[in-house]
Amino acid sequence: MTSERSIPEPVTAVLEGAGAWLPGELARVEAGLTEIIDGLGPLAADGAATLRAGGKRMRPMLVLLCAGPGGGEAAVRAAVAVELIHMASLVHDDVLDRAPLRRGIPTTYATAGRERATTLGDALFSSTFTMLARAGDLRATELLSFTAVDLARGELLQREGAYDLGLTAGDYENRCRLKTGSLFSAACVLGGEAGGAGPEQSEGLADFGRGIGLAFQLLDDVLDLAGPPERTGKARGTDLLDGTVTLPVIRAIELDPSLAVVDLNQLDEESVAELSDRIAATGALDQVRAEALAMIDRAKSSPALESMDPEQRRLLELVADGVVQRYS
């Protein structure tokens, strides 16, 4: 069973500027993902469809780049594991959200139903830790176990805060650190350690990854309100319809307190478009974009990158810049 896919931005830009080692390692990651998916038995077809749906492969890219050319099998294995965890979490998110589409493609939830999609997510999580256990990779097993718990905690915070326009920026950041930043952070740490990073540099790489992840989430939330469906793969204002309160909404309420009385439970496709326009009119989207850009700049100035090989650092900065370019 194959999983052909086009290589997305910002990965293409990095590949064009990298040496021969990086495309080869990414190909090994794709082969590893396909091998795991093919081993899922009756769920293999559903898993292959999820894999073919693609994505940016930013997390595996971060693993490989933080490891550098000497990361070897440990880096490839970590990259596969990180992407499998990401895939599993998305499948479960789609079940919780009752999402018909992801990246413009029907979800497993939509095509196969709640039970099968839930089981696929469970199988992806389990397969990740089976692979790591067989390799005796205790470090990756431990870190990704903690990360999986963080993902669940972040998802729970999102559910508990649904439709609550009283959420603060601090509430939002805490949720996103768990739900998004934790896996980016783990990717950078596992990659760095595969490449020989010591404790101090690993800590710096954790902060770098977390910063990239938070910026990624901020810009994704901006795009939900501003981006056309053909670009986002979902209807505009989907987060609002789901009751998910994001930083652009929080900043908009700070700028226009009259928005705080909106009843998100009463939104439909027409009224959500009007509300999205009202939020944009406050200037909140530009403010959140600026906050995300500042996060990217801070991440790129991390001391953990300063001690790297210049070419390795340049490629990591390309990935960071790619987060911004995708939303420009």
What residues fall within each predicted segment?
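Alpha-helical phosphate/pyrophosphate-handling elements in metalloenzyme active cores
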Residues: 40-84, 124, 169-212, 248, ...
